[in-house]
Regions:
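Intrinsically disordered, low-complexity regulatory regions
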Residues: 1-101
């Protein structure tokens, strides 16, 4: 199970990008930039910005785990589904969730 705070996510993603249409928006390369200001620039709610960052964070972790050899058998898949709380949805549904991130 993954436990992290919004602060953990912001710290991890402070030099990452927000993708909207075909443009990339810098989330934060300047320490003084507040995420609420970024949300205003993107015309988004603050929570939507954080939610998207969290989904991207989970997606990267999930993909890393999928390609980890220790998770390549049936038992490994079950462990991953439990870790990400995805036991009750199909692989196709998981893919759709992450594509919308």
């Amino acid at each position: 199970m993954i436990y992290f705070t919004v602060d953990d996510v912001i710290d991890k993603y402070k030099n990452s990008y927000w993708s909207r249409s075909d443009e990339n928006y810098l989330l934060s390369n300047v320490l003084a930039v507040e995420y609420s200001d970024i949300a205003k620039v993107l015309n988004k709610e603050y929570d939507d910005v954080i939610y998207k960052i969290i989904k991207n964070f989970l997606h990267k972790e999930y993909i890393n785990d999928i390609f980890n050899k220790k998770y390549r058998d049936g038992e490994g898949t079950s462990i991953l589904r439990k870790k990400y709380k995805l036991e009750y949805i199909t692989d196709t549904e998981i893919d759709k969730i992450f594509r919308s991130a």
